Design a protein with these regions (language model features):
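Predominantly soluble domains enriched in secretory-pathway, periplasmic, or organellar proteins
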Residues: 2-13, 18-341
Length: 341
């Protein structure tokens, strides 16, 4: 090969290398951009700088997951190490009994007023139902991988979102009768009085709505920068805490899900509860250790008050019969009881 030919070949190889490498880099960059963000988490709360409002009682280790029953007046609180469900008298704050669970839970709900309590036991891949007021386990149903949240339709059909499988299990009469696919990593589920099921994909960053009877999907819509929890409200609306985006998002459920409002709420909003009798919404701010009381006003929310909370207020519940509000303090094993104005 002549010196000139060698230079020509070397130049062509160099150009080919230059042209090839950026294409590969661009492909890797595009793949990285397509990868969904990690699931949002609550802020890690600093030590308290203000006395919590209302009363504070000791409830047990690492409480997270709470629901208040308007018929019995009991409050169910999920604990871990050991994995238990504490049944607390809402008025006095006294723990009446503790129910051993196969695994810990982070979300609780009621199948109906009066119970049973729906307990998605994450590590055991099961839905445990606990009767009220006695605390007896009425059923333990195998479901999908890492059940994170559960909610019941007016018909009694129960929907359990399986976070690691990106599915929802449908449970009737204590047994799983089927599954439906959901958005990536479903972390929250709620059902309207009209039988529409809202599922939040905490990594898919969407709200998807299903018909509870037919299981047909009515569609998906964006759910902010990092949604975590969803609650159903009046007029077939869903309220979603966008924890990473510092907001509460408001949606019409049907005929197709549509975002109709956004309320800015800095402070890492996380836990959320609806008081249907008073048309109020409660949201915990884990970065600021506050719980915020809102009035539901159509497409928006009107702030009523803020209350200092126990440390790491990840979950909140309201007893609609009394208006009493309960907040879990995960760090110190406490339950806060508020009598709002």
């Amino acid at each position: 090969m002549t010196h000139l030919s060698f230079r020509r070949v070397f130049t062509l190889l160099t150009l080919a290398t230059i042209l090839f490498v950026p294409v590969g880099c661009r492909a890797e960059q595009n793949a990285a951009q397509r990868k969904p963000p990690p699931a949002p988490e609550p802020a890690e709360a600093p030590p308290l700088d203000e006395q919590p409002a209302g009363r504070v009682v000791e409830v047990g280790s690492a409480p997270e997951g709470i629901v208040a029953d308007p018929e019995s007046g009991l409050v169910a609180v999920a604990l871990r190490n050991p994995n238990e469900l504490a049944l607390v008298e809402g008025e006095s704050g006294e723990t009446l009994r503790r129910v051993e669970l196969p695994e810990s839970a982070r979300h609780l709900d009621l199948a109906a007023p009066g119970g049973p309590v729906l307990v998605p036991a994450e590590g055991s891949d099961s839905l445990v139902q606990v009767g009220l007021p006695d605390g007896g386990i009425t059923s333990e149903t195998p479901v999908g991988d890492f059940p994170h949240s559960a909610a019941a339709a007016p018909s009694g059909r129960i929907f359990v979102v399986n976070e690691m499988a990106s599915t929802a299990s449908i449970v009737e009469d204590g047994r799983e009768i089927g599954k439906i696919d959901t958005a990536l990593k479903p972390g929250g589920v709620a059902v309207t009085d009209s039988g529409l099921v809202g599922v939040v994909g905490v990594r898919g960053l969407t709200l998807e709505v299903f018909d509870a009877g037919t299981l047909e999907s009515l569609g998906r819509t964006d759910a902010g920068e990092g949604p975590t929890h969803v609650r159903a409200g009046p007029e077939s609306r869903f309220y979603v805490t966008d924890t990473r985006g510092d907001a509460v998002l408001i949606y019409e459920a049907g005929p197709q899900p549509k975002q109709i409002g956004r309320v800015s709420l800095p402070g890492s909003p996380y836990g959320i509860a609806i008081d249907p009798r008073r048309d109020q919404l409660w949201v915990t701010l884990t970065a600021e250790q506050r719980v915020v009381q809102f009035a539901l006003e159509g497409r928006t929310l009107r702030e009523i008050a803020r209350y200092p909370t126990v440390r790491q207020p990840n979950t909140v519940a309201v007893d609609p019969a009394t208006g009493r509000v309960f907040v879990t303090g995960k760090t110190d094993g406490q339950l806060q009881i508020l009598e709002p104005r």
